[in-house]
Amino acid sequence: MVEQAQGSLEEIERQFLDVAQRDGLESLQEDVKPDVKSDLNGNGEEKRDRDDEDRKKRKRSRSRDRGDRDRKRSRSRDRRDRDRSRSRERRRDRSRDRNRDDRRGGRDDDRRREPQEPAKPREPKKYRFWDVPPTGFENITPMEYKNMQASGAVPRGSVQSAVPVVGPSVTCQSRRLYVGNIPFGCNEEAMLDFFNQQMHLCNLAQAPGNPILLCQINLDKNFAFIEFRSIDETTAGMAFDGINFMGQQLKVRRPRDYQPSQNTFDMNARMPVSSIVVDSANKIFIGGLPNYLTEDQVKELLCSFGPLKAFSLNVDSQGNSKGYAFAEYLDPTLTDQAIAGLNGMQLGDKQLVVQLACANQTRHNTHLPNSASAIAGIDLSQGAGRATEILCLMNMVTEDELRSDEDYEEILEDVREECSKYGIVRSLEIPRPYDDHPVPGVGKVFVEFATTSDCQRAQAALTGRKFANRTVVTSYYDVDKYHNRQFN
């Protein structure tokens, strides 16, 4: 019976295990089998206790495993959340960086493509107006000016008070000439060299160097513009009208935008000028005129001193100039100035002769007080004097200009640079005003050269130059007085 029962139990157990394996319940094998066996062999209670403990251990183990898995899953979720959070933050950072780069990308690209140049130091303001002549004194050299001062023809201070400031646009217009009918194929350099050479060959250049600074050619319309360094040389350059260049006869004219000074030629243009010059005490004779000068060109030369009352250019039967003319100024006091300024002037290959046409006529109100024979505190009745190493430049600066430290330094630099072109400059002195105390030599510029010959070259070159719209007057100065700072 026991064996039969045991066989039945084994059969039941086998069937149960098959079902358990099929349902994935292998763990129940150990639980069921001991219980059945314990019931059969009488040790059921003890085995049940052990089985209960085993089940509890397995449950605790499974609970621990499940807890471990839950904690791992939780940590994994936390790690994934943190990773996703970091990824989102990195994406936001990259997005912000891209937006920032886009906003400033243009500026950054410009900086990368075009690196900023280092800031250049401020260049000193150029104070150079050497070749801008004051109205009424365009053709007067310092020596002629001294003679006018000695005769009392120009009052003290009249140069500065009578000279309006010339704007740069007016100055540029007055220094340009139109050149028409230019030959095909000519270039700017060739034309520039040609006119500069002609200016020197005809003795029309007033200083060393090239009188013409710039040439601009319009090949499509067959004309050019040339720009001179001074107004005087520009007027003289009009004498080249009709000159032959590379087989072509050039047309030299004033540009359309040219406007003469309002205080001179414009006044004369508004008032009719008589073609008959009657005999009077103020009638002047102008001889030695180049035959190629037209009536308008001669009138323009005379009008640089003031408006004309009457003018007559003597011509032959064919209308060609005979080389002399007669004129009278609207203001009789301008007669002496024009004579002193024009007489002996070199114009082309000829020298002008300007004098009173009626010497026996009695003149009225043409002489000025003798006290007017000084300018800037120096007697101009004498010439430049004996040549020394010291050159004194007068009528260049005013007290107001010397009071400003910035202007004073710029004047010093400008004068030194210009004088260095003619020789070695050892020292330079420009006396400055001091409060209300009188300072000897204010308004004069003293330049010490290395040699007397250097000083003579500078005197010859700077004579008649213009500085700040003022005619520069030159004179040699005693060496001992200069070194002792006796500038009176």
UniProtKB/Swiss-Prot annotation:
Single GO biological process annotation from the record: nematode larval development
Superkingdom of origin: Eukaryota
Pfam families noted in UniProt: RRM_1
One function term, GO molecular function aspect: poly-pyrimidine tract binding
SMART domains in the cross-refs: RRM (SM00360)
Keyword field contains RNA-binding: yes
Keyword tags: mRNA processing, mRNA splicing, Nucleus, Repeat, RNA-binding
Keyword Nucleus among UniProt keywords: yes
Biased composition (Basic and acidic residues): 25-55, 78-129
PROSITE patterns according to UniProt: RRM (PS50102)
UniProt function note: Necessary for the splicing of pre-mRNA. Binds to the polypyrimidine tract of introns early during spliceosome assembly.
Family: Belongs to the splicing factor SR family.
Protein name per its UniProtKB record: Splicing factor U2AF 65 kDa subunit
